[in-house]
């Protein structure tokens, strides 16, 4: 709620979650005066280490309260999703099953595969009413993580956000997702992954900042997790990003897909340009030939049925019935036990 500087700032950094209060909380290793002396850079305490800075830029803070009361209320909400310790499971709230169909989900994904939509609308329809509690809401917004309840059961949600950068995975999104997955696994909180990912963000900036090792953090976190892990693919599931986002190939317990799902190495146009490159180049009308091959590839792979026939998808579900399927899936997997090999600890690619 107040300032924290110097060596003392590593104390909150070691905790599971940090909640700051806007206007009064500051965190930095070296304060504005030292920064001015060493680098001649003038910066205020708020700009250097205030709540807004650590919520959006650094991602150090997980929540920010408008005032002290709001901060305390956020803490209470957070604790309500957690067990007392790592040897217990979170308490289930009373819930009576009713009509769990959600008709609005049937029209939530646009027909145009390149048109964005807000994944939080999907989350709010799948989870219990007003139960989603987002973590790091202003940092790496192309991935959404947070706690929710499903028929009273506490779960962790990791979802790609098509409304931001088309939902791609980048360095910050990978780190954000990996940390949340590991926390949920540490405290026996089941995981729901909602996937619409076109791939990893390309470019020199990402490569030079270690997208390989950072993307591997998310992969490692999912592979290491022993809690129930269930995935719903709403639209795109392309390439390595598909594998990383809790696919069957890395041990997911159940994978569902909507009819709009596209599970492939890449999008139809990009794949057609590579696979049929010679044929397109030698054609009298390359543009027309590309279009034909794009449609051919899309008909074969821009659907979930080919993947389902290979066992990568357990069931293709109607969007409106997804919540009902998830309630049953988490109930079935609630007694999941995994015997891990004896070791001191794993070596996540930090």
Task: For each feature predicted by the language model, list its residue ranges.
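Ligand-binding clefts of soluble mixed alpha/beta catalytic domains
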Residues: 1-350
């Amino acid at each position: 709620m107040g300032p924290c500087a110097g060596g003392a700032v590593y104390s909150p950094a070691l905790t599971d979650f940090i909640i700051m209060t806007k206007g009064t909380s500051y965190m930095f290793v070296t304060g504005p005066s030292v920064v001015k002396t060493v680098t001649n850079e003038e910066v205020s305490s708020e700009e250097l280490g205030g709540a807004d800075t650590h919520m959006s830029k650094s991602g150090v803070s997980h929540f920010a309260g408008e005032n002290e009361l709001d901060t305390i209320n956020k803490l209470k909400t957070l604790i309500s999703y957690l067990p007392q310790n790592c040897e217990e499971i979170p308490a289930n709230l009373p819930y009576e099953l009713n009509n769990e169909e959600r008709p609005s989900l049937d029209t939530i994904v646009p027909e145009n595969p390149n048109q964005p939509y807000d994944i939080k609308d999907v989350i709010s329809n799948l989870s219990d009413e007003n139960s989603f509690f987002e973590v790091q809401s202003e940092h790496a917004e192309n991935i959404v993580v947070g706690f929710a309840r499903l028929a009273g059961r506490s779960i962790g949600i990791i979802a790609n956000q098509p409304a931001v950068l088309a939902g791609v995975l980048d360095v910050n999104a990978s780190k954000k997702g990996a940390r949340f997955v590991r926390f949920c696994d540490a405290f026996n909180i089941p995981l729901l992954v909602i996937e619409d990912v076109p791939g990893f963000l390309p470019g020199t900036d990402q490569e030079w900042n270690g997208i390989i090792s950072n993307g591997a953090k998310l992969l490692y976190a999912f592979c290491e997790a022993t809690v129930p892990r269930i995935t719903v693919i709403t639209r795109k599931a392309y390439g390595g990003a598909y594998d990383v986002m809790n696919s069957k190939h890395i041990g997911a317990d159940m994978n569902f897909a909507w009819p709009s799902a596209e599970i492939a190495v890449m999008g139809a146009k990009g794949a057609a340009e590579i696979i049929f490159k010679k044929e397109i180049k030698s054609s009298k009308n390359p543009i027309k030939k590309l279009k034909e091959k794009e449609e051919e590839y899309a008909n074969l792979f821009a659907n979930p049925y080919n993947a389902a026939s290979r066992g990568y998808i357990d069931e293709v579900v109607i969007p409106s019935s997804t919540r009902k399927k998830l309630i049953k899936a988490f109930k079935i997997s609630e007694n999941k036990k995994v015997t891990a090999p004896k070791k001191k600890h794993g070596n996540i690619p930090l």
